[in-house]
């Protein structure tokens, strides 16, 4: 399975993109100091 949801990486500010296997949705693991669905919000 190709993880098309992460190419290109939708996460902002160098967040780490991964695919939720149960839903097929992308999720972002944000670097420290950022929050939001795609790490778009500085803390």
Swiss-Prot record:
UniProt domain EGF-like: residue ranges: 2-40
Keyword Secreted among record annotations: yes
GO cellular component: extracellular region
Domain of life: Eukaryota
Pfam family, one: EGF
Disulfide bond among keywords: yes
GO MF annotation terms: toxin activity
InterPro entries, sorted: EGF-like_dom
Main localization category: secreted
Location in or out of the cell: Secreted
Disulfide bridge partners, by residue number: 6-28, 11-30, 17-39
Stated name of the protein: Augerpeptide hhe9.2
Protein species of origin: Hastula hectica (Sea snail)
């Amino acid at each position: 399975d190709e993880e098309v949801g992460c190419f290109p990486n939708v996460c902002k500010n160098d967040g780490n993109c991964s695919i939720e296997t149960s839903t097929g949705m992308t999720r972002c693991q944000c670097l420290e100091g950022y929050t939001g669905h795609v790490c778009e919000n500085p803390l």
